[in-house]
Amino acid sequence: LTKLAVTPQDICWDVGAGTGSVSVELALQGRSVWAVERQAEACELIRKNRAKFSAWNLHLQEGTAPEACETLPAPDAVFVGGSGRRLQEILTLVVRRNPKARICVSAIALETLQEAVRCLEGLGYRADVTQISVSRGKSVGQLHLLLAQNPVFLITGEPV
């Protein structure tokens, strides 16, 4: 979330919101947040998490991006947690709605990483890539090992 450099006045989108963890975190900081999610089960989890954390400034927009984003207020900051292979269309819509929007895309696949950088640069943004790695400890006999988990890439974009 730090990568988005959000301010209290910002309107935020969380596209491909999943369970809404990013949306809730943004909402708890006082931002107006629109969680966009297409899967019914995930939408139900977002509703439950919104109630659990009293994040009433979190609005759920059920549907597929980018179409589901058309009627939302123009964003200042956008987190893309899932794109359904429509990243170019989603990012193009974001920039059309607000050419100064700050964007962060999460990726676990190298193809998504490459596409995010290409799309952001093609839209006149500077792309910055951060890799996040986590290792979990495991005891094997008298040894303690750290087993690496799959890395996550965060691609942030700011207008040049």
Model features per residue range: what roles?
Residues V36-A77:
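S-adenosyl-L-methionine
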